[in-house]
Amino acid sequence: MKKVWINGCFDVLHHGHFKLIQYATGFGGNLFIGIDSDKRVKQLKGEGRPFHTALQRKYNLECILGVRQVFIFDTEEQLRGILETIKPDVFVIGSDYIDKPIIGAEFAKEIKFFDRIGGFSTTGLLDE
């Protein structure tokens, strides 16, 4: 079975996250997910974030059918180390990363881009 990788904050799961997971699982049977640590989410998203702790986010994702394993990473080096160990067949990432450096891409056999679903973002939901 193919190993498929996605990563992100996944702070408050919404429709866009589920579409990403559905898209990624279409490439193979084993979906591995990396999530940013609480410290990293706060650095990326600002004060008041994350809404859910890393352990809560990990648990929520592990409850989704098709998710094989969820990893929490605190640094880019840790993310690279996880990807080097897993060596995914497919690395799925948002299409906003086309022509941008992708951390750990060198460990994947193939990169697939996912077009984000307009109007769905955790930040947008929390700001409402």
Indicate where each model-derived feature is located.
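Nucleotidyltransferase catalytic core that binds NTPs
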Residues: 1-128
